[in-house]
């Protein structure tokens, strides 16, 4: 008898078919406090990381950009001035609650032109080959069940000469800081999650998912195996997060 394929959900092993639902439950729970969560996880640094991420994207006026796991709208809001009136940004997210929060937030800011929102699975993108000049994914890849499949899809929908960028928590490069980082991730963060959002378990999963995510070298190799060329890595904040960039040639 064939065994049911499994994957990780934080430190738990779960059936592959269940992970998307479990991750969806987490993000539906934290959707309206997602910025607060990111501030707690990064001491507010996520705002600077996102600015740097978009600054290194190479996006130009007239480009068509796909922002995956972009439901909060943070990256889209930064991309819109870069694509200009002739360009466009498609925000894709598998979680409808996240999309609603992000769409409402950007509507309140009057950001409408050149922006569209769509619920989609990063492992099966609903676009033709070579549709986008750039694909971005910030703090989303670690929650994908089959990361290699998502990377291959990102490569598929890129135009020749296009680039994909992944911003994600990664492996700390300064080992002396690891005990303090672990204390914050596994003890402080879940307790704050319980006090602020009444949801300790979701915040515990998010901390665990960071540790289970591939390190810098492993993710770079995965991108190369998915077809990307000229893959480079930039560590931010001593490797707490990293930007991976690859090109379709």
Predicted regions and their residues:
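Class I SAM-dependent methyltransferase SAM/SAH-binding core
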Residues: 64-124
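A short acidic, Gly/Pro-enriched loop at the edge of an enzyme's catalytic core
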Residues: 123-134
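Core SAM-dependent methyltransferase catalytic element
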Residues: 226-249
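Conserved alpha-helix/loop element of class I SAM-dependent methyltransferases that forms part
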Residues: 29, 33-36, 40-63, 78
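A short glycine-rich, Lys/Arg-flanked "PGG" loop and its adjoining helix->strand segment in the class I
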Residues: 148-163
